[in-house]
A protein has these predicted regions:
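Short, small/polar-rich motifs associated with maturation and membrane association
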Residues: 1-364, 370, 375-377, 416, ...
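N-terminal processing/targeting junctions
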Residues: 21-23, 383, 407
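Conserved protein kinase catalytic core
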Residues: 124, 197, 219-220, 351, ...
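Extracellular/periplasmic, surface-exposed regions of secreted and cell-surface proteins
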Residues: 139, 184-185, 191, 360, ...
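Short, conserved phosphate-binding/catalytic loop or strand-edge motifs used
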Residues: 168-169, 479, 483
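A short beta-to-alpha transition loop/helix N-cap that caps and shapes the active-site region
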Residues: 253-257, 385-389, 642-643
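Flexible glycine-rich, low-complexity coil/linker segments exposed to the extracellular/periplasmic environment
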Residues: 263, 267-313, 403-429, 547-559, ...
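Flexible, solvent-exposed loop segments that connect beta-strands
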Residues: 304-308, 482-488
Length: 743
């Protein structure tokens, strides 16, 4: 009996143990499940490479050549997300289903995407002008870099040149150079306000960027649109509760080409020996002859044999591993009648070239309030940055590999301190040549939109903007690294530039569509005032070794200067777009603009554009071409102007001579002879393009041909000495042809 009891207890124990082992397995089997299926388009064709992801995990797969997939989900309650380029995403909760077939719907955004244009918006398929759009998520791929760099890769016909200096503004060219001497930079429009450039934008605040390239798109901006237009739309608040977004990005910035192939000491002397032989000179004795004959201005008494003991890599001495940090905090809040977006950004850059650095802080506030037919809004942005730089790259470029960094036998501690460029590491370590700059920028805009409901499609808008900028810079050059015989000693200068701008818009928009017709009209006025005040004081033979010349009283002298002035523009603009049966497109714009930079007779210029488009893919004879989603032919002709010249071109201007003549008296001379004939520089452009989208919008792009001719070009013409003035404004012609393919 006792034996039976023991056996029974043992059996029960084994049974409990087996149940304990099996139940977790059953539980896991109940959670993990294999889901299979097929993904097709609306026509039933299989889609290859569709991403299938279990939400909340990293568990995912893609469809095969037949559009089929298989995935083991961890929880059958977790949604499966199906995503594919050109189609809307779809989420499905498996539940108890183990076979899930999915039909993805085409994403119409590619074709019906709304682009921002001058004083309004338009569907991409209805665009006749040449416009490229870049969204914020596309720019986010350019991590660590400036957002301007993404324009070159994402907008066809755009060139971006960046010198790599921390905080520097890249040079941007749209379809080449349109003006030789009067500026070729495009016009920046941020939230409808002209001017400010890319420095007035924090890349984290950008919602989208539109690049306007041809006259059909830019003519309405008059003179300022001659070199293309870049429209930046910043983020606005969205309905919902208070949301915070914190973003940090950091990284290293190594020198892009550290191996410059600089000659070693041995290679240098071999080249010099060959050079002497080529001109018929006798070879030198490495043990007796000093190095001076190799370089006529060099005074070192050492021989080649002594020099061969040194092989210095000067590039390595002045470079480092650069790094950057970018911190952005954004706030988003919105209700039924009001929305707010605010952000603060801090960025620091240490260049891969020693001595170059930048620190910047910026902030933005966008607020909007709606009540009935009226919308009121404000947009404000401010930025402060501090930069430090020294000119050392030019110093390194001509330093010999046999030159020592430090020579204890030399009274100054290093070779030839009298050279014009000085000693690179001594300059670095002691800030003997230093440039510092501080910049503050501020812009605020108040706008009001009114939708006039009693006239369907009619709305009016008025806005006023004020901008302020302050740029201060200091430069210091120690007397230790000036040329031999130079009696200027310590040198320095200090500059202060103040800019102010005011801008006003008032315009009306009418947008209406009937059965077979569509009409979009914009008409309005714009007024601008800009003011500049720039003062520079400079001095030489300064006492002490202060690197930032703060005691400006000791520096005043003949090298001081002041430049200032103000200018005004006023324009009346109009644009009309018409479409018939959603596929025949016509457009025209006209602008009359006046500038205070020209004399009364040439003050006003008239600029216009005409354009047309044909959406061929909507025709009946194209309906059987199923692989073509969009095929649009477009063309335009237009004329824009340029008045980007100094205000004194049409006036006589004088300058003070730095040297004193005529009985030691200060004298003045005529610096610029007034050119009363100066008038608007004109750019005439022709643009022909073919826009396409294929295979359910999976492939899209454009092919374009354009030609731009510039006449009445504004540029400086050098005068002979007998004229008594060095220069005056003149005219020239520039013709160019370009071809472009983008996708």
């Amino acid at each position: 009996m006792n034996s039976f009891t023991r056996i029974g207890l043992r059996s029960r124990f084994l049974l409990v143990l087996m149940i304990g082992l099996i139940l977790p397995t059953l539980s896991v089997w109940g959670q993990n499940a294999t889901i299979t299926g097929k993904v097709v388009d609306p026509k039933g064709e299989p889609l290859v490479g569709v991403s299938v992801l279990e939400q909340g995990t990293t568990n995912g797969t893609v469809t095969d050549m037949n559009g089929r997939y298989s995935i083991v989900v961890q929880k059958d309650s977790s949604p499966l997300r199906f995503s594919y380029m050109g189609f809307d995403n779809q989420e499905i909760v498996p539940g108890k289903r183990r076979v899930i077939d999915v039909t993805l719907t085409e994403n119409s955004v590619v074709i019906d995407d709304v682009v921002v244009i001058a004083y309004g918006t338009k569907k991409r398929r209805d665009m006749i002008g040449s416009v490229s759009k870049i969204k914020s998520d596309e720019m986010s791929l350019m991590q660590g870099g400036r957002f301007e760099n993404s324009l070159q890769g994402l907008a066809s016909g755009v060139q971006v040149v960046n010198d790599g200096m921390p905080g520097s503004t890249p040079q941007i060219k749209i379809r080449g150079i349109g003006s030789i001497a009067s500026g070729s930079d495009p016009l920046w429009v941020v939230d409808g306000i002209v001017g400010g450039g890319s420095t007035m934008v924090n890349s984290n605040d950008i919602e989208s960027i539109e690049v306007l390239k041809d006259a059909a798109a830019t003519a309405i901006y008059g003179s300022r649109g001659a070199n293309g237009v870049i429209i930046v739309t910043t983020k606005k608040g969205k309905k919902g509760g208070l949301k915070f977004d914190v973003h940090y990005e950091g990284g290293i910035t190594p020198i892009t080409n550290s191996d410059l192939g600089l000659a070693s000491t041995k290679t240098y002397f071999n080249i010099m020996d060959e050079a002497r032989a080529n001109v018929g000179l006798n070879p030198l004795d490495p043990q007796k002859d000093i190095i001076e004959p190799y370089y006529s201005n060099w005074t070192s008494p050492i021989t080649r044999e002594e020099a061969m003991n040194t092989d210095m890599d000067w590039v390595d001495l002045v470079t480092r591993m650069g790094h950057f940090h970018d911190i952005n905090v954004a706030l988003n809040q919105g209700g039924e009648n009001s929305t707010t977006y605010a952000s603060v950004n801090y960025r620091s850059d240490e260049s891969s070239l020693k001595g170059l650095s930048m620190n910047a802080v910026s902030a933005r506030l966008n607020s909007e309030f709606k009540k009935g037919i009226v919308t009121l809004g404000t947009q404000s942005f401010l930025k402060f940055d501090r930069k430090k730089s020294t000119n050392k790259w030019a110093v390194v470029s001509d330093k010999f590999p046999w030159r020592k960094v430090y020579d204890p036998e030399d009274p100054t501690g290093y070779w030839n301190p009298q050279m014009a460029d000085g000693h690179p590491t001594a300059t670095l370590d002691n800030d003997y040549q230093l440039s510092t700059g501080e910049n503050f920028s501020f812009r605020t805009t108040l706008y009001m939109d009114v939708n006039l409901k009693w006239i369907k499609g009619l709305s009016v808008r008025a806005d006023a903007s004020y901008g302020y900028g302050l740029a201060q810079s200091d430069y210091w050059l120690s007397g230790l690294i000036t040329n031999t015989g130079n009696v200027d000693g310590n040198q320095g200068n200090k500059s202060k530039k103040t800019t102010k701008s005011q801008q006003y818009h008032a315009f009306a928009k009418y947008n209406r569509e009937w059965t077979d017709h569509g009409l979009d009209i914009v008409t309005g006025i714009e007024a601008n005032r800009s003011y500049t005040d720039n003062a520079v004081v400079a001095g030489k033979n300064l006492s002490g070794e202060f690197q930032e010349p703060k005691i400006i009283g000791t520096m005043l002298g003949n090298n001081s200067a002041y430049i200032g002035g103000e200018s005004y523009t006023f324009s009346f603009f109009n644009r009309i777009d018409y479409k018939f049966k959603q596929r025949y497109l016509l457009g025209a714009s006209f602008v009359r603009e006046g500038s205070s930079k020209f004399v009364k007779e040439n003050r006003f210029g008239d600029f216009y554009s005409v354009s047309g488009g044909w959406i061929i893919s909507d025709e009946a004879f194209m309906r059987n071409a199923g692989f073509i989603s969009l095929l649009k032919l477009r063309g335009s002709y237009g004329e824009t102007g340029n008045q980007n010249i100094p205000s004194e071109v049409t006036k006589n201007s004088y300058s003070i001579k730095s040297k004193q003549y005529y009985n030691n008296m200060q004298n003045m001379f005529l610096w610029n002879i007034a050119n009363k004939a100066a008038k608007w520089e004109k750019n005439k452009s022709i643009d022909l393009g073919l826009d396409y989208a294929l295979f359910n919008n999976k492939v899209n792009g454009s092919i374009a041909y354009y030609r731009r001719t510039t006449s009445d070009m504004l540029m400086r013409v050098q005068f002979p000495a007998s004229a008594g003035s060095p220069n005056s404004g003149g005219n020239a012609d520039n013709n160019s042809m370009w071809a472009n393919v983008g996708s």
